[in-house]
Amino acid sequence: MRVLVSPAALCALGFLAALAAVMQYSLRAYVPGSLEPGGFTLANFTALMKPLYARVFLDTVWICFLTAFFTLVVGYPLAYALVHARNVALKSTILVITVTPLFLGEVVRTYSWIVVLGNNGFVNSMLLKSGLIEQPLQLMFTRFGVVTALVHVTLPVMVIMLAAALSHIDRDYERAAASLGAGPIRAFLTVTLPLSTPGIIAGVTTAFAWTFSAFATPQLIGGGRVNMVSNLVYQLGFASFNFPFAASLSVAGLALTFAVLGLMRAAARPLERFGPH
């Protein structure tokens, strides 16, 4: 254990040093035409109160909630099948489909969704050929497209966490419910689902945090029409070279993420008692 302390301490120091540098930049004034920041100021944080930036924060939080919710809706059946399926081939297929995206970069996965959601992409081509639509649907550069692609990004970790929780549930609980007259659906709703709440909480909070920090997916799929905090930080830092304001936006985003995750954990704490002990 002591052998691992030094590397962990070095990593922690690296993260703290980077955070301190960003904090220091966020409290400095922007000097137009210069990459060097000016003196101490709180103007960067007061500027975040403007409706434009407040709207970006609200949109980002809403997209994070949507992504976490739909990732849970898609991931739970996959995790359940992965744990309880008796067919080895089916288990292997689910595992490969779920885990493979982890071996691909976010940019690669995002470009694959451009191929799927574009005006000449797979979805529109199938709908046009089937006669269901007469002209391509606008799926790119929309919130729907961004959330869809982000669900694909966060799905593997959701399935892994849910599968870990489901695998620790003793099947005797379900058998006991069945022996008392509960059908499969009622047994799932009254036994399996409550006992898997620790995995649900872990998966949802992780998906929320990953989505909040996502950059490539909203940048490429959103195309500048769906603004999130990470994209705005990029625009301010590398297009306007306003690094102090970009740093203040990063700090505010980090604080908001911790606040929302803290509220989610506090709201879900009463449910954790249903988990397996």
What would you call each of these model-derived segments?
Residues L180-A182, P194:
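Glycine/proline-centered hinge or cleavage motifs at structural transition points of membrane proteins
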Residues I169-Y173, E272:
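Short glycine/proline-centered loop/turn elements that form peptide/ligand docking sites
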